[in-house]
Amino acid sequence: YKLDTTTGVEITNQLDHANGGLQYLSRSDWTGTWPTVDGEVSDQISTWGNPINGTDASGKAASYTYRKTISKEDLAKLDSFDSLNTTDPSTLTDELVYGKDNGLGLIDMRGLDYNDPKWNDLLDQLTPSDYQTLITQSGYGTAAIKSVDKPSTTDRDAATGLVNYGVDASGNFYFKGNITHCGVIVLAQTYNDDLATHYGENIGDESYYLDVDGWYAPAVNMHRTAFSGRNSEYYSEDPFIGGHIASLECEGVASRGMYVFVKHYAINDQEDHRGDREGQYSIATFLNEQAAREIYLKPFEMCVKSDKVEMNYAKDNGDGTYSNATTEIPSVTGIMTSFNRVGYTWAGGNYNMITGLLRNEWGFHGFIITDNANTGVFMDAGQMIQAGADGKLTNLPTGARYTFNKNDVSDYHYGREAVHNILYTIA
């Protein structure tokens, strides 16, 4: 297709930066693209069936692994906070507006389209402190924002239900109860649309009793191998089955007024070498556009394009009165990004992945949050908002690692987009 069948946007390559400069096997030239040995022979015996290429200490024929040393140029890419956003900051001309008194509350935005002009009036009421809070402290919920009468929200984790315990900002442990359903692998193997929808509806119903607003799920990464990280959270090795069942689950959850964060966007394949400590890089994953779109991104695309659900709201009649009204909203208004890098660039700060593909091509509007940024110390909030994502999953002040610059046009421009996305989902 030349155009996206849902949005009508022209489809262009977004992941050329992620192919690693490798030659990929292709049916168009089976012989010419067949993989060959690359690198230099190491001193480590292979356990993966490498061809015999030497002898061991006793003189017997042996197979050694090959190794490559990363170049200084590529190492610098890993160490960079470049979001791949090519916009020149000097071309941004936003007028800096904070703290206006327009008399609006977040409840007034419920039921309005993402692009309704009224959003600008609401966003003008926010203060620099509001920007800092929403961008850097959105882990497991968002804080109350007085300037727009926004209540606090609670978001909870677990791919099979709601895990409602943790440590609050004061370091105190709390427990409010957990509810867990069957594993999603079992759900996917039923091929039962009604059951998948009811699965989501049940979780949405349970959110009322646990005072939960958002759900860090479903998780739609692939069963690439039996040894991939967190396979128990993911549906299938088949992207269509995973995407279809998860989409129905999202529709069920959203029909109850709860918002989801479909995760981990994207190409999240393991839970080792995530970059959980100072001085660590997260793992860099290389692949081509075809593999990404047909396999690893397909479940996310299906969820984002799933059916809309009805939402009730109080409609402002413009004469001081309100009436009950119903509108349709997307089933998916939240995405959680991943620890890993797509190519050399962190997935949660990757402009091509987030703005180029998710927002522009697929038409996604809503809250994009990082994975656990309390431990993901490399997750830079500046890179994140420049890429088109919105909030860090941190609930500890030390997790911010970013200060919103109220006088910087670039910070304001991307920060305003970020808080708009967050508030749209919550409204």
Model-found features: residue ranges?
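Glycoside hydrolase catalytic-domain context in secreted enzymes
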Residues: 1-427
